[in-house]
Amino acid sequence: MMKYVMAMASLLLMAMPVKAQDISLGLDWFVNPDHAPIIIAQELGLFADRGLNVDIVAPSDPSEPPRLVAAGRMDMAVSYQPQLHLQREEGLPLLWAGTLIATPLNCMLVRADGPVESLSDLKGRRIGYSVSGVEQALVTALLKEGGLTLDDVTMTNVNWSLSPSLMSGQVDAVIGAFRNFELTQMRLEGVEGRCFFLEEHGVPSYDELIFVVREAQAEATWIDEFMDAIAEATQRIINDPDGMWDLYVKAYPELDDELNINAWRDTIPRFALRPSAFDARRYEQFAAFLMENGLIDEAQDVDKLRR
């Protein structure tokens, strides 16, 4: 009888639903096609299938989410590889947990009809940015190739308003503009833009968007489940881009426009196919680049940058 009771109790426990783990995820920007694997994983129930209840948060300040993660006030954030190197230099307890976009997207964007035709033309100009630290670091490298330093330009924080501030003449160039988004945004507004691609002007190639967690979460198994969901969502997008676009705009109907359709198509080839794969060599090269340019004080052990 006792064995029967215990067996029934075990079956009842197995039948009871397991409470999903709540995970807060801070984005780097407002929702856009760069975040497609996250949105698709959410809409297809891929997070829920793995016992995760993911709260996706768009920031009011794009520099805020990684610091909230470091402070233990958020579980995970979408961030940038260059920013992670600098944040570790500051002593923030952040670790790479996966890759979302595996190529550079960032560029120095100028008006095609404007006065900046080469990097040396930036002397005396105003450069807009949205995230302090990482973008100013990249500007330093670009200016160096043009024979300039930060003292030769004026850096202006324009927050979200990258292409609008350029089109209005508030600034002469912007850093942090994504080649898959702002170029199209300007064209649709009737203004042609031109990008100086970082990786063609002395900056080593890097992962544009990554997931970061705090060190105390390094061994958390939910991170593996999260990244598995991202990998599956990415494959779904590649296999059925039109069907997944329909699902994406069903969740965010305000994004169903020409700008986002173009950005969706331009972004798909740049998603990390193996988001849990860490390219140590790439991180070593970028850390060396930052040190050579005086942006970090000493070489970083890249194994300590990852979970």
Regions found by a protein language model. Give the residues of each.
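N-terminal secretory signal peptides that target proteins for export/translocation
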Residues: M1-M2
